[in-house]
């Protein structure tokens, strides 16, 4: 598809659906806030990856060349605290869970980003940005830290709608702040923590500064789309805009935010203890089925997890899969065709995946009727269209990704990467006689459906009866 029909996307900054017009004709630049690699990925994390992978695939189908950047936050308070509690180097902890996230994305066939920068690899760019903000009077030093002066930027709140009097950064009280509404750009060095030299002393970057510097480095001072979870609208994305604009640059022209995965009406999060880890989910369903489920709701809506909803999604996916296999057996090879006009209309309407999937299942129903009546040409036509549509959604059952790999083996391989990272943490805790941490890790794995057995050859785990 190269005629590029009109695409409309909901822009959080505008609070409305807008026509999408890229900065450069034929090219789209996207920045997605990636993971803070502090622990195992759960389906709430991966939903964001799947949602914006569909956006990327649709833009490619429309004929755009897409630059897609997804960062890795590998230096953060949570990473430092968890690594210290486990007696591990912070960088090793971050690298371990970065691999776990990569395995989870790969298991669900989320396309690799054009670049995946780590925060620690871009300290120079962050320091340069902060220097510009200080020079322009938008930032100041205090007790070894550097803060952004919120009152110096009158447009603060334009993304989130927050009134300046209602701003709470969630950073706690800091003695170096002139105003508690200000936010941290740079944290002064503390004993035992990593630090880098700067003109105002050693320290490490604040979270909000990291993404601005990396977005500028890979996409320039102005780019098309910034994506992330709706929980990032404030303060993270609001603070990104303030820094970039105050420094004299543009920033993202469209802001897209996905809804949460919820359980019992509450956001899925580690702090609430209601997460469903990827290993547990891959025990219950195949990777393609999990991807179908996570991508089936509108990206801006909440996805309330339930076993019934998951099994309904599996049943729907299997119905499509079985139809395509029937056509291939009775008619012959099924090459991808073109999406239906109604499917294209749905995705052009702010990525309305539920309406797009309704078109997939309508085509399946018509194809089954054609096949049953002996209309092989009609059945093949519907099957080819379905392959195109499901391919854009990233879960075409006949794609070589799912066809040439035994899915249970692929899932098990992904689980193995994730579980062994946790077992490595547990062994180090045992070596240090940190029995409480070792038990905590074992219990966490048990909650994910994984049983650990200590043997003379080291810990072994079982998943659904299969030993590793």
UniProtKB/Swiss-Prot annotation:
Query: Could you say which EC number(s) this protein's record lists?
Result: 6.1.1.16
Q: Where is this motif: 'KMSKS' region?
A: 267-271
- Catalytic activity, per the record? tRNA(Cys) + L-cysteine + ATP = L-cysteinyl-tRNA(Cys) + AMP + diphosphate
Q: Which GO terms describe its molecular function?
A: ATP binding; cysteine-tRNA ligase activity; zinc ion binding
Using the UniProt record, give the first listed, main subcellular location: cytoplasm
Question: Where does the protein end up?
Answer: Cytoplasm
Per the record, its GO cellular-component terms are: cytosol
Give the first-level EC class, as a single word: ligase
Q: Which cofactor does it need?
A: Zn(2+)
Q: Where is this motif: 'HIGH' region?
A: 35-45
Cite the binding residues for ATP.
270
Chain sites annotated for binding Zn(2+): 33, 211, 236, 240
Which keywords does this Swiss-Prot/TrEMBL entry list? Aminoacyl-tRNA synthetase, ATP-binding, Cytoplasm, Ligase, Metal-binding, Nucleotide-binding, Protein biosynthesis, Zinc
Record text on cofactor binding = Binds 1 zinc ion per subunit.
Query: Which Gene Ontology terms describe the biological processes this protein takes part in?
Result: cysteinyl-tRNA aminoacylation
Q: Which SMART domains match?
A: DALR_2 (SM00840)
Q: Which NCBIfam families match?
A: cysS
Quaternary structure per UniProt? Monomer.
Q: Which family does it belong to?
A: Belongs to the class-I aminoacyl-tRNA synthetase family.
Identify this protein by name. Cysteine--tRNA ligase
The lineage is: Bacteria, Bacillati, Actinomycetota, Actinomycetes, Mycobacteriales
